Amino acid sequence: MATAAQPSLELALELMSKVPLIGNISQSTHKIPIQCTGLTREQDGHNDWMHMIRAYYDFQVDDRFQPTKDLAGHVDLKRLVQGRAGAVFWSVYVECPKGENDFSDAVHHASMRDTFQQIDLLQRIMELYSDRMEMAHKADDVMRIFRSGKCASLMGAEGLHQLGNSSSVLRIFHRLGVRYVTLAHAKNNLYVDSATSEAPIHHGLSPQGRDMVREMNRIGMIVDLSHVSEKAMVDALDVSLAPVIFSHSSAYALVPHVRNVPDHVLDRLKQNRGIIMISFIPWLTNKDPEKATVENVVDHVLHVGNRIGFDHLGLGSDFDGMPSHVQGLEDVSKYPNVVAAMLQRGISTENVEKIMGMNVIRVLREVEDVAASQKGLLPVLEDAVPQLWDDGIRAYVKKLYPHAEHDRTGASETTTVDKAIEKDV
């Protein structure tokens, strides 16, 4: 039996749910009740199941995905239920274009198309498992879905390369339900340097990157700083009006890997009211990845919590986005193990509740609030579209409709269209 001094896995499960662990969902029809005033179920800030389906199952959602079936990898519906997943940010990640530092539109078109395919894939999964999972678009949706007993599902895109260099596409992603965008993945892009690129090219955020962060603030898209260079982390924290996240990173002080977050950036994160979601990636968790354990994950939680407070923490597994796993966190069914480990290490139930999901819900709500407060104040970031009509056609239109609006507000110089009209006259 568990004691107050040494909470066990059984106590963690009791805190997460009042029903027995469901081992075979075909034998049970009940949903897991939520205690919204006590510990909620686990919230995962980054899960790559959609990439596993694309890469291993060739994008095919068929009879293999029936709720009672076992799937390859770290995730399937049975294990999500066993692990009491309460909310998940599903990554709609696609790979960066081949080569380094080619930021032309043409090389990014395939990434943009593939991202729309991944969004469609997740929506098909939602339809298949509609009695267990539901898409969430706002913080209030997450809480409502929590209370219904389903898994609240949100989307995150993993790199601005997925936009095809278009702010219009960013806004379309947001309308489709994407709620965070990681600024970079493995390579530099037009907007930002990656932590793992061959060499920096912007030395942080480019001017376009600063504009993109402001546009994300304006529309209510969370800025995710996992994968970006250290200088880019600082630049984004300088620019962002809203809290930012690290969706799947850990503490550099414990494991000095470029994907982890240095203490001075953590200090800035506290000022920003953002969160770092501690990853389950072995090489970010322990200097010897083969020895990485759930206890090491909690080491990172404690380091961050003791330095900047437990209000700035979450969990971001990267399940199905890595070839191995941390001991004790083999797949999504093992989420309760990290809860038990946090309790055993003396983290209060109140703080565990925050880490398990309440912090990210707060950030989501504050990002929504910033977008509402900036409505009409921040200008829309418009794409630079090449001129389609030549000056002759444009002069004809301007002459045909002399009393219509023509020139942009504030334009002072005589345009080539005006000159064409004058010549025609």
Curated annotation (Swiss-Prot):
Dipeptidase; part of the gene cluster that mediates the biosynthesis of an unusual class of epipolythiodioxopiperazines (ETPs) lacking the reactive thiol group important for toxicity. Firstly, L-tyrosine is prenylated by tcpD, before undergoing condensation with L-glycine in a reaction catalyzed by the NRPS tcpP leading to the diketopiperazine (DKP) backbone. Afterwards the alpha-carbon of tyrosine is oxidized by the cytochrome P450 tcpC to form a hydroxyl group. Belongs to the metallo-dependent hydrolases superfamily. Peptidase M19 family. It catalyses: an L-aminoacyl-L-amino acid + H2O = 2 an L-alpha-amino acid. Induction: Expression is positively regulated by the thioclapurine cluster-specific transcription factor tcpZ. Its cofactor is Zn(2+). Substrate binds at residues 185, 259, 318. The gene is tcpJ. This is Dipeptidase tcpJ.
